[in-house]
A protein has these predicted regions:
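Short, solvent-exposed loop/turn segments at secondary-structure junctions
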Residues: 7-9, 110-114, 163-166, 174
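Active-site nucleophile loop of the alpha/beta-hydrolase fold
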Residues: 2-12
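Short beta-strand segments
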Residues: 3-4, 105-109, 159
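Alpha/beta-hydrolase
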Residues: 15-147
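A general structural signal marking secondary-structure boundaries and capping sites
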Residues: 10, 14, 30, 186-187
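Charge-rich, low-complexity amphipathic helices
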Residues: 13, 20, 24, 170-171, ...
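Catalytic active-site module of serine/aspartate enzymes centered on a nucleophile-bearing elbow/loop
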Residues: 143-187
């Protein structure tokens, strides 16, 4: 099993770690980028949105990922963000996994990168929110990684400092190295 930024309580919960509610509450601490105006050139097309993401985050989301997140206007511009059913709906009735008896690789971003726009911001409110979020994220995600590591003796847990949630995009070389190393132990 390979968990790319997915070793959270929905995937492993033996009752000793943080809850999904704690992770959902954490999202509220994160600084929020101001929404783009409808005339923003970054919304002219999905390719333009990818380039805007590259400037803001330092990497690009695949076009398919963006098309799942955003609607398309009749003139092919990027539209509004789609309503996601939400974590609560998605997680309702999910089986709790408290035992994983197979080899596993779990890669965590600890702490998560907040994006170039946050690093470049000089706004005091953004800086304060970023600091609070980073401290809470570090504590909570470190706790979950430790619970995963202690609760799944067959796991190799990797912590990538400052990676994005999309670790395979922000830290592709690290992910490939860890995957190759993990797969070599299965032979």
């Amino acid at each position: 099993l390979v968990y790319l930024e997915a070793g959270y309580p929905y995937a492993f919960d033996n009752g000793t770690g943080p809850t999904m509610k704690e992770f959902q509450d954490l999202k509220n601490l994160a600084p929020k980028a101001p929404p783009p105006s409808e005339s923003d050139p970054g919304l002219a097309s999905f390719a333009a949105l990818q380039q805007a993401g590259l400037r803001a985050l330092g990497f690009t989301y695949p076009e398919g990922e963006l098309r799942q997140r955003f609607t398309t206007t009749p003139d092919e511009r990027v539209g509004k963000e789609r309503d996601f059913p939400g974590d609560a709906t998605m997680l309702e009735g999910m089986k709790k996994y408290a035992d994983i008896p197979v080899p596993a690789l779990a890669i965590f971003a600890i702490p998560h990168d907040q994006g170039k726009w946050v690093h470049d911001s000089t706004g005091p409110k953004v800086r304060e929110a970023a600091k609070a979020y980073s401290a809470a994220d570090l504590a909570l995600t470190t706790r979950q990684a430790k619970v995963f590591e202690e609760g799944v003796p067959t796991a190799h847990v990797v912590r990538l400092r400052g990676a994005d949630h999309y670790v395979y995009l922000s830290n592709e070389a690290d992910v490939l190295r860890e995957l190759k190393s993990f797969l070599s132990t299965l032979r």
